[in-house]
Amino acid sequence: MKSIVPASWLAFLALLLAVADVALADESFILATGRRDPRIYAIDFNAALKPRNNNTPNAIVSRAKVHPDRLDGTPVGDPANIVLSEDHRTAYVVNHHGAVNNAEFLQHGGRGSISVMDVGRMLRPEFDNTDRAVERNYDSGYFGAVGLVVLPDLLLVSHSENWLTEDGSNRISIIDRKTGGRRAQIEMALGHPGHACPDFPVPFVSPTPPPTVPFEAPDPRFGCWPNPEFIALGHGSDGRTYLFSGNAGTDDVSVMDLHQALMGAPVVEIAPRIPVQTGPFGIKASPNGKFIAVTARESGQADFEGNTISIIDVDRARTGAPGAEAARVRVGTDDPNGQARPFTVAWTPDGRQIIVANYRTNNVSIVDLRLALAHDPRAEVARIPVTRPADADGLVRPGRPKGTAVTSDGRHAVVSGGPRLDPTAPPSGTVWVIDLRTRAVVATVTGVGNDPYGLTILEDRPD
């Protein structure tokens, strides 16, 4: 079978797993997705830290549209995730439902898209609220796009939905970065113990009738389709790289052979899936690639939200050995039955701590890896509340944290959040900066999108 990528991806993956050890640059920026507000918000990091800018939008330098407007002037797009290229000159933005008008599209299962954006233009105030940063847009290859991994020449894009439904996906697309063409597609196995699945072939062959799937969660019929959410790359002691996905539909984590996927093989899961507390969402590899942290966000089958993160041992997972879930840590709440809805995770550069955004309990957890692997109940070493000032209507709404990132010097965590409001409402999202030494919020930026999800930190402004 002919490979669909050059050998350069191996060198890139080694670089990806290396830990950066540089100081935060003077010109550093936070790039936050606006989600229901289809723009990327560029925030001056150091301006955000100035006390006079706290609880204001003053540190926002520009807002870049992710799609050209409709001909009638309506803004479109649904940016939920953002990842930078190797040289940080290009941003790849995942639009969960593609070029939709969020005031019209009020359900799941929109066709995903990728916005390719010039980072330098995203930072220029004169291009505020324009599409001047958009270089091109292309189809993501399926429905409900969310997870994204950047490889040399290629993108891996996971999809958690099917056409106009919240259930029904088992697809991860492999997209050509230059042309936007779909070069291959990973097809994941259906089902998990106790859940019968329709007679639907994997890999797919035509003609096959479309499956009947639940419209939206919660629904007890969830459990057949994995519905992969975020994805991450882990590094085995065998020198190979493995793709992990958090499967919201089947409450587990898949491990896949990336090399086989890049050779064009559609079926690449190589070991039994690892069950977690409930449907996972955010997933991230440790800086050395040996561990995968994943959140247990919510069940698709019942009205239940999780309160744990799982730490997956890559070597045990890839070999199917017992104990692949090396640790499970309760976060966000002291109540074993409490519902925290952990959303995403980020690692500190030294790999010692994991930052967790807990949506339902409106706080951010810090988990110590060493204590977690020792099954110490004190592994959650800090729990930091995040709050918001009043919105334009005078109401003080919960923080609802979602996205997470950590600066390369390990000093600060950055968290995005905020409630989902009517798409016509003024920007209501929030970005918090947390000092990881004092474990306290040191800056709050307001007016960042509507229900913002993913974000990233840019520490070397392109020329």
PLM feature segments, named:
Residues 21-463:
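Predominantly soluble domains enriched in secretory-pathway, periplasmic, or organellar proteins
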Residues 8-18:
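Bacterial N-terminal signal peptides
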Residues 1-7:
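Positively charged n-region of N-terminal signal peptides that target proteins for export
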